[in-house]
């Protein structure tokens, strides 16, 4: 299995007020805290699943 060091850059674009607690925990797990905060993570299936779960809150920058 080859290791690719591809990264995904995320930005939190919507507020967490009024969202489910599990979605808030997922956003925290992605390393995002405040609106417009940016986090760069490894591109893994687990991270992709987390992004899909909170896709209405985050934007993939690159």
Curated annotation (Swiss-Prot):
Domain of life: Bacteria
A family per Pfam: Ribosomal_L30
Biological process, per Gene Ontology: translation
Gene Ontology molecular function: structural constituent of ribosome
GO terms under cellular component: cytosolic large ribosomal subunit
SUPFAM superfamilies membership: Ribosomal protein L30p/L7e
Keywords: Ribonucleoprotein, Ribosomal protein
CDD domains named among the record's database cross-references: Ribosomal_L30 (cd01658)
Gene3D superfamilies: Ribosomal protein L30, ferredoxin-like fold domain
Alphabetized PANTHER family for the sequence: LARGE RIBOSOMAL SUBUNIT PROTEIN UL30M, MITOCHONDRIAL RIBOSOMAL PROTEIN L30
Family to which the UniProt record says this protein belongs: Belongs to the universal ribosomal protein uL30 family.
HAMAP family documented for this protein: Ribosomal_uL30_B (MF_01371_B)
Oligomeric and partner information: Part of the 50S ribosomal subunit.
Name under which the protein is recorded: Large ribosomal subunit protein uL30
Organism of derivation: Polynucleobacter asymbioticus (strain DSM 18221 / CIP 109841 / QLW-P1DMWA-1) (Polynucleobacter necessarius subsp. asymbioticus)
């Amino acid at each position: 299995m080859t290791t690719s060091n591809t990264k995904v850059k995320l930005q939190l674009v919507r507020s967490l007020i009024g969202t489910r607690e599990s979605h808030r925990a997922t956003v925290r797990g992605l390393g995002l805290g405040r609106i417009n905060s940016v986090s760069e993570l490894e591109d893994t299936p687990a991270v992709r699943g987390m992004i899909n779960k909170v896709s209405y809150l985050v934007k993939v920058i690159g």
